[in-house]
């Protein structure tokens, strides 16, 4: 007579083999998900590289920041146009070039796209505040952010910004980086680039900007929308005087 199968009792527990099988399944799923994430990340980096390489000979039509601002304005303030016109580097006043360097990144011509001391100071300030309030950005870092990234402040986005900064410094010379920056940076509500700023504020081409006009425009860069609405701000005039005095020492990037 055959023995009847014995049913698991109330204290029955799955075998070690079954537990190992489940763990292997979870590990495979995690490996797959990690591979998909890594592949997507790599594809994104290759896209950035391809775009930047193309911009060594082709002028960018717009930036991610500009497109986001255009969308926002079209919904919130549809009467406000986007003003932007690309002009060659030699059609931008040397006064504006010197003023922007004096105001935003005094060592731009010689640094590698990063200022380690500024990054460390920003890190300490952010740590003290418990959130990101400062980025310690050079001109190249600002360009990386404006060309590709959102306005969100996070350490992940900051890391991506540093990677794109390295790409820009590797694939483009300093003069080209500065040319793209001057043609894409925000100078006011819907105002992008040196030519649009010169026409909007002074009704002249960017090539004719004076030292004082250039200093005022450069001072607006950290908060352009605010200063667009507060052009008579005492701070704007005071800070412009400081920048005007520093412009003579500002070193422009060498032509390649």
UniProtKB/Swiss-Prot annotation:
Enzyme Commission identifier(s): 2.4.99.28
Keywords carried by this UniProt record: Cell inner membrane, Cell membrane, Cell shape, Cell wall biogenesis/degradation, Glycosyltransferase, Membrane, Peptidoglycan synthesis, Transferase, Transmembrane, Transmembrane helix
Membrane topology, record value: Single-pass membrane protein
Localization per record: Cell inner membrane
Main location: membrane
One Gene Ontology cellular component annotation held by this UniProt entry: peptidoglycan-based cell wall
Enzyme class: transferase
Catalytic reaction list: [GlcNAc-(1->4)-Mur2Ac(oyl-L-Ala-gamma-D-Glu-L-Lys-D-Ala-D-Ala)](n)-di-trans,octa-cis-undecaprenyl diphosphate + beta-D-GlcNAc-(1->4)-Mur2Ac(oyl-L-Ala-gamma-D-Glu-L-Lys-D-Ala-D-Ala)-di-trans,octa-cis-undecaprenyl diphosphate = [GlcNAc-(1->4)-Mur2Ac(oyl-L-Ala-gamma-D-Glu-L-Lys-D-Ala-D-Ala)](n+1)-di-trans,octa-cis-undecaprenyl diphosphate + di-trans,octa-cis-undecaprenyl diphosphate + H(+)
Pathway: Cell wall biogenesis; peptidoglycan biosynthesis
InterPro entries referenced in this protein's UniProt entry, alphabetically: Glyco_trans_51, Lysozyme-like_dom_sf, PBP_transglycosylase, Pep_trsgly
Function of the protein: Peptidoglycan polymerase that catalyzes glycan chain elongation from lipid-linked precursors.
Family: Belongs to the glycosyltransferase 51 family.
Record-given protein name: Biosynthetic peptidoglycan transglycosylase
């Amino acid at each position: 007579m055959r023995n009847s199968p014995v049913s698991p009792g109330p204290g029955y527990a799955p075998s070690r083999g079954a537990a190992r099988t489940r763990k292997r399944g979870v590990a495979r799923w995690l490996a797959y998900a990690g591979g998909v994430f890594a592949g997507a990340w790599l594809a994104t980096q290759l896209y950035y590289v391809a775009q930047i390489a193309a911009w060594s000979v082709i002028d960018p039509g717009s930036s991610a920041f500009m497109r986001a601002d255009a969308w926002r304005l079209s919904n919130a303030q549809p009467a406000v146009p986007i003003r932007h016109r690309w002009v060659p580097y030699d059609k931008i006043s040397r006064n504006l070039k010197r003023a922007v360097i004096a105001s935003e990144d005094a060592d731009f011509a010689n640094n590698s796209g990063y200022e380690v001391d500024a990054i460390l100071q920003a890190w300490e300030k952010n740590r003290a505040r418990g959130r990101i309030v400062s980025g310690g950005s050079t001109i190249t870092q600002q360009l990386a952010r404006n060309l590709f990234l959102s306005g969100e402040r996070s350490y992940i986005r900051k890391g991506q910004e540093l990677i794109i900064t390295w790409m820009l410094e590797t694939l483009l010379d300093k003069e080209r980086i500065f040319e793209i920056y001057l043609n894409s940076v925000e100078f006011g509500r819907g105002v992008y680039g040196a030519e649009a700023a010169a026409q909007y504020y002074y009704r002249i081409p960017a090539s004719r900007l004076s030292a004082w006009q250039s200093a005022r425009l450069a001072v607006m860069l950290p908060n352009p929308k605010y200063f667009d609405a507060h052009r008579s701000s005492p701070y704007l005039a005071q800070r412009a005087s400081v920048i005007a005095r520093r412009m003579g020492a500002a070193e422009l990037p060498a032509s390649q």
